Amino acid sequence: MCSFLDVEVKDRFVEGDFGMSEMVKSNLANCSSRVKRPMNAFMVWSQTQRRKVALQNPKMHNSEISKQLGVTWKLLSDSEKRPFIDEAKRLRDKHKQVSDYKYQPRRKTKSFLKNVYNHKDHLTKATDQLIKTQHLKEDSTTIYENTMKCPEISSFYCAQESTYLDNWMNLPPEQENTEFWQGLFTNETETCRSLPHGQMDCNECRSI
């Protein structure tokens, strides 16, 4: 017994109306009437080879099959490629007889172009940030190197660091928080006094 749903589906199938939009129908009609480009020698050869590889490896993905065929084709000698090269030439000559042929590459979708532009913008921003960071590092290194070239400043900082470290290592644990910091400022004053008068740096030395 046939239901109402079966009758409706069967009628739509017979009429050929699958609920497709007019744009989809138009694209299908254009694809069926469009003249395809002729195959090259590799495509002619891979037609039969692809079937063989697919039968031998049913679970192999199509992209992996293509990679394997590409490697195998490169390993073939010129004499082995010759029949397929001749066949490809015959197909090209036959294709030239079609006067209304026009190369029509596939149009890239808007979403694809948007992803390309977004990726390009991201790379540009990342590159700019990397350049700015590199410039900051170079400037800091140059300032430090120029500063340490001055003998008075270099010896002053080296003496400070050595004095602070020695005082801290020689302090008992119960006095490290008070005497260390008191000695720090005392040593700073003594170190500054050893410098020429115009290069004194601490507040006490400036008042001398």
Curated annotation (Swiss-Prot):
SUPFAM superfamilies: HMG-box. Acetylation of Lys-110 contributes to its nuclear localization and enhances its interaction with KPNB1. Deacetylated by HDAC3. The keyword Nucleus applies. GO terms for cellular component: cytoplasm; nuclear speck; nucleus. It comes from the Eukaryota. Pfam families: HMG_box. The keyword DNA-binding applies. One of its GO terms (biological process) is neuron differentiation. Keywords: Acetylation, Activator, Calmodulin-binding, Cytoplasm, Differentiation, DNA-binding, Nucleus, Repressor, Sexual differentiation, Transcription, Transcription regulation. GO terms for molecular function: calmodulin binding; DNA-binding transcription activator activity, RNA polymerase II-specific; RNA polymerase II cis-regulatory region sequence-specific DNA binding. Residues 35-102 bind DNA. It is found in: Nucleus speckle; Cytoplasm; Nucleus. Belongs to the SRY family. Interacts with CALM, EP300, HDAC3, KPNB1, ZNF208 isoform KRAB-O, PARP1, SLC9A3R2 and WT1. The interaction with EP300 modulates its DNA-binding activity. The interaction with KPNB1 is sensitive to dissociation by Ran in the GTP-bound form. Interaction with PARP1 impaired its DNA-binding activity. Transcriptional regulator that controls a genetic switch in male development. It is necessary and sufficient for initiating male sex determination by directing the development of supporting cell precursors (pre-Sertoli cells) as Sertoli rather than granulosa cells. Involved in different aspects of gene regulation including promoter activation or repression. Binds to the DNA consensus sequence 5'-[AT]AACAA[AT]-3'. SRY HMG box recognizes DNA by partial intercalation in the minor groove and promotes DNA bending. Also involved in pre-mRNA splicing. This is Sex-determining region Y protein. The gene is SRY.
